[in-house]
Amino acid sequence: VVGGDECNINE
């Protein structure tokens, strides 16, 4: 996912 928030949730 290109973005910041969703990537953070994924991590």
Swiss-Prot record:
GO biological process, alphabetically ordered: proteolysis
Enzyme class: hydrolase
GO cellular component, one term: extracellular region
Primary site of residence: secreted
UniProt modification remark: Glycosylated.
Domain of life: Eukaryota
Keywords of the record: Blood coagulation cascade activating toxin, Disulfide bond, Glycoprotein, Hemostasis impairing toxin, Hydrolase, Protease, Secreted, Serine protease, Toxin
Expression by tissue: Expressed by the venom gland.
Keyword ATP-binding attributed: no
Location in the cell: Secreted
GO molecular-function terms, A-Z: serine-type peptidase activity; toxin activity
EC code(s) of this entry: 3.4.21.-
Keyword Manganese annotated: no
Task of the protein: Thrombin-like snake venom serine protease. Releases both fibrinopeptides A and B after 90 minutes incubation, but only fibrinopeptides A after 10 minutes incubation. Clots fibrinogen with different clotting time depending on the species: bovine > dog = human > goat. Fails to clot both rabbit and cat fibrinogens.
Similarity field: Belongs to the peptidase S1 family. Snake venom subfamily.
Quaternary organization: Monomer.
Protein name, as recorded: Thrombin-like enzyme albolabrase
Record lineage: Eukaryota, Metazoa, Chordata, Craniata, Vertebrata
